[in-house]
Amino acid sequence: MDHLAITNCQLTESDLTHLSQCLNIRQLKGLDLSGVTMTDFSPKILHILLEQVAATLQELNLEQCRITESQLKSILPVLSCCSQLRTFSLCGNVLSMAIMEKLLRHTTGLINLSDEFYPAPQESYSPHGALHLGRLAQLRDKLIEIMQDLGRPRAIWLSSSPCPCWSNKTFYPEEPFLCHCYMSA
């Protein structure tokens, strides 16, 4: 087994614990947990699961998981050890600009990471939930500045998810925004 998709269903902490103990899990290249609500999970459970797959994982999809910022903070150290990671998506979750900055800093060493899909920062939405494109542009510029400070070229997509359906996802801008910075010698 090199790809595993468990999507849009209810899992318990016990289910994820058992999954992390499977013998073949260390060979996993793709893990898709999109739509699995993680709000009530201990951050340690996901951390342990990612530890098991860190050496081989190439694709990680945590879309629409309701992952909390404390859970995300908990997995950042192990996420930065996923040296083979190429694609990572957190679309459909609510993330602040502060946690997105931490995420960018922790993943900057992942040289294979080429496709990054993140939600528009929660600060780009009005109190009523409407996406404010002007504010999003300002936050995008701030993210570009952060990536330039980190010194590694990368491409990132920001998305809004007006509803849980993948087909209604809109990316801003329609192309990824690129950071063309180079590490100094």
Give the label of every model feature segment:
Residues T17-R26, L46-A55, L76-S83, L103-G109, ...:
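Leucine-rich repeat
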